[in-house]
C-alpha cells in the first residue's frame, strides 16, 4: 500500500506526501513497480522539479550513462529537470543507500574489513572473505576448500580473467548488485559461466537485451554502464548469507534445522574467527559481520576492550562471553547480523528490542517495530506507542497514532490513553494553554488524512469531537 502510494504521489508531485512516506514510513526511495520504473522516473516524466530535487537529495539513483539515468533524462518533461539530473552530484556518483545492510556489504567489499584471503588478478589485489564467497557460490566454496585451501594469497594469471570483470563479479557476490562497463560485459559473462553463477548470467543476458531495445527506440541515448540490481523482494542474497548463521548455531539449538533439506553444503567450512559464548552455548561467528554492523561489537572486538577475548582452545577461534542475553534472543541477533532478517513473534520482539538497543542495531530495532505493529488493538496500542517513544521508533510511533485515529472514540474512554495525553502535555517545556500536544497533533493529522469523500467528512468530525471533548474534560486546550 505504501509503495503504490509513493508512485501515485510522485506522479501528482505531492512533495509532502512523498516526504512522509520516505521519512516516516521507511519506504525505499529506489523501489520499482511492475513496469521497472522508479519514483524518480515518474517525477521527471510528470515535470515535478521540486520533487525531483528532493528525491535526488534522499538517495534516488540516476547515474550518468546507465539505463535508469538515461531513461530519466530522456523522459524528463522540462529542461530545468534535465539540467538538475545532469548537474546533481548523484548522477555521476553512486548515491548513499538508505539501507543499512546494503551500506554494510558495500563497505565490507571496499574496505576488506577482517578479510582472510587476497586474490591477485594480473597484479591487482582484492581483499575478500572466505565465508562470503563460500556462502554465495558453490564454485568458490569448493575451490577454497581444495585447490586454494590454506592460502592467504591466490594469484590468478589466466589471460581471459579480466580484473575489472573480476571486481564486478565480487560486487555481485557481496551485494547482489553489479555495475560493469558495456565493453567488459562479455568478460563478465565468461567469469559467471566459470563460477557457475547461472542467475547472474541470465540477468546479464536479459539486461543486455533490454538496454539494446531502449537505445534502438530512443535516438540520442547512450548507455555505457550496465547495472544488475535484484528486485526489492528478491531473497537470494539474504538466504545465502543466512547460511553463515545456520553454520554458526551451536548443535543444541539447531533442532530441526539440519534435517533435510540440508542447509549447508557437504563439507562447507564457514571459517569462523570468533566464538560468542552465551549461557553455555557457543556460536561460531565472523568478526567482519559483527564489527561491521555494530559499533558495540566493534568496540568489544577491535578496540581497547580486546582483553575481553579468551584464548582459543583446541584450535578453535578466540571466545568472548556475552552476559545479560539468552541463547534464543542471541539467535535473533545472529540471523539479523548475517541476513538482515529474523522471524520475530510480537512476544519475542520486546526482549530482542532491548538487546538491539544495547548492541546499537537500529535495523533490528525496526524489525522489532514491524513485529509489534502486528499486535495493535485497543488494549495494546497505548503500551506499544510508549515503547516506540522510548526506543525512538518513528515508524512504529506513526503506526500507533494512525491506529489511535481510527479508534479514538473508544480510546477516549480508556484511562491509559488519558494518562498518555496528560504526560505528553506535561512533557512540553513551559507549555502555554494554547500550545499543541504532539500526540494529539499526530492523531488529528491521521484523522484528517483519511478524508477523501463527503461521507468521510462527517465521520472524521465525530472522531475529532470525541478528542476535543476529552481535552476539555481534563483541562487541556490545544
Curated annotation (Swiss-Prot):
Gene field: ABTB1
Compartments, record wording: Cytoplasm
Species the sequence originates in: Homo sapiens
Superkingdom of this protein's organism: Eukaryota
Gene3D superfamilies assigned: Ankyrin repeat-containing domain, Potassium Channel Kv1.1, Chain A
Pfam families: Ank_2, BTB
Name of this chain's protein: Ankyrin repeat and BTB/POZ domain-containing protein 1
Organism placement in taxonomy: Eukaryota, Metazoa, Chordata, Craniata, Vertebrata
Keyword 4Fe-4S assigned: no
GO cellular component, as recorded: cytoplasm; cytosol; nucleolus; plasma membrane; ubiquitin ligase complex
PANTHER family in UniProt: ANKYRIN REPEAT AND BTB/POZ DOMAIN-CONTAINING PROTEIN 1 (PTHR46231), ANKYRIN REPEAT AND BTB_POZ DOMAIN-CONTAINING PROTEIN 1 (PTHR46231:SF1)
Amino acid at each position: 500500500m505504501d509503495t503504490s502510494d509513493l508512485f501515485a504521489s510522485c506522479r501528482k508531485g505531492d512533495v509532502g506526501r512523498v516526504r512522509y512516506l520516505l521519512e516516516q514510513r521507511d519506504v525505499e526511495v529506489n523501489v520499482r513497480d511492475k513496469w521497472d520504473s522508479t519514483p524518480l522516473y515518474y517525477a521527471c516524466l510528470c515535470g515535478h522539479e521540486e520533487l525531483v530535487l528532493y528525491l535526488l537529495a534522499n538517495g534516488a539513483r540516476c547515474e550518468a550513462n546507465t539505463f535508469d539515468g538515461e531513461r530519466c533524462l530522456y523522459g524528463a518533461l522540462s529542461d530545468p529537470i534535465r539540467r538538475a539530473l545532469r548537474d546533481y552530484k548523484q548522477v555521476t556518483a553512486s548515491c548513499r543507500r538508505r539501507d543499512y545492510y546494503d551500506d554494510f556489504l558495500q563497505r565490507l567489499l571496499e574496505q576488506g574489513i577482517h578479510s582472510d584471503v587476497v586474490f591477485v588478478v594480473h597484479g591487482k589485489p582484492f581483499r575478500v572473505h572466505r565465508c562470503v564467497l563460500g556462502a554465495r557460490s558453490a564454485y568458490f566454496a569448493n575451490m577454497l576448500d581444495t585447490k586454494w585451501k590454506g592460502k592467504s594469497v591466490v594469484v590468478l594469471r589466466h589471460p581471459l580473467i579480466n580484473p575489472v570483470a573480476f571486481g564486478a563479479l565480487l560486487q555481485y557476490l557481496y551485494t547482489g548488485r553489479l555495475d560493469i562497463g558495456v565493453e567488459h560485459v562479455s568478460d563478465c559473462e565468461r567469469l559467471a559461466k566459470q563460477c557457475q553463477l547461472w542467475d547472474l548470467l541470465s540477468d546479464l543476458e536479459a539486461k543486455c537485451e533490454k538496454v539494446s531495445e531502449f537505445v534502438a527506440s530512443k535516438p540520442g541515448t547512450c548507455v555505457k554502464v550496465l547495472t544488475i540490481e535484484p528486485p526489492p523482494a528478491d531473497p537470494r542474497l539474504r538466504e545465502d548469507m543466512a547460511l553463515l548463521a545456520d553454520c554458526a548455531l551451536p548443535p543444541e539449538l539447531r533442532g530441526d534445522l539440519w534435517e533435510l533439506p540440508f542447509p549447508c553444503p557437504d563439507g562447507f567450512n564457514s571459517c569462523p574467527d570468533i566464538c560468542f559464548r552465551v549461557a553455555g552455548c557457543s556460536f561460531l561467528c565472523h568478526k567482519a559481520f559483527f564489527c561491521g554492523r555494530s559499533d558495540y561489537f566493534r568496540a568489544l572486538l577491535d578496540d581497547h576492550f580486546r582483553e575481553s577475548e579468551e584464548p582459543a582452545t583446541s584450535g578453535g577461534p578466540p571466545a568472548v562471553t556475552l552476559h545479560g542475553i539468552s541463547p534464543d534472543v542471541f539467535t535473533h541477533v545472529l540471523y539479523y547480523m548475517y541476513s538482515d532478517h529474523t522471524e520475530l513473534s510480537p512476544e519475542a520482539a520486546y526482549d530482542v528490542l532491548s538487546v538491539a538497543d544495547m548492541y546499537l542495531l537500529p535495523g533490528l530495532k525496526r524489525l522489532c517495530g514491524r513485529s509489534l505493529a502486528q499486535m495493535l488493538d485497543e488494549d495494546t496500542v497505548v503500551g506499544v506507542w510508549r515503547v516506540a517513544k522510548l526506543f525512538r521508533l518513528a515508524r512504529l510511533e506513526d503506526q500507533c497514532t494512525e491506529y489511535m485515529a481510527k479508534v479514538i472514540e473508544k480510546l477516549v474512554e480508556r484511562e491509559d490513553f488519558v494518562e498518555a495525553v496528560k504526560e505528553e502535555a506535561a512533557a512540553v517545556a513551559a507549555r502555554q494553554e494554547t500550545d499543541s500536544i504532539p500526540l494529539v497533533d499526530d492523531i488529528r493529522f491521521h484523522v484528517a488524512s483519511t478524508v477523501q469523500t463527503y461521507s468521510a467528512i462527517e465521520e472524521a468530525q465525530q472522531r475529532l469531537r470525541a478528542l476535543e471533548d476529552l481535552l476539555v474534560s481534563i483541562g487541556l486546550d490545544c
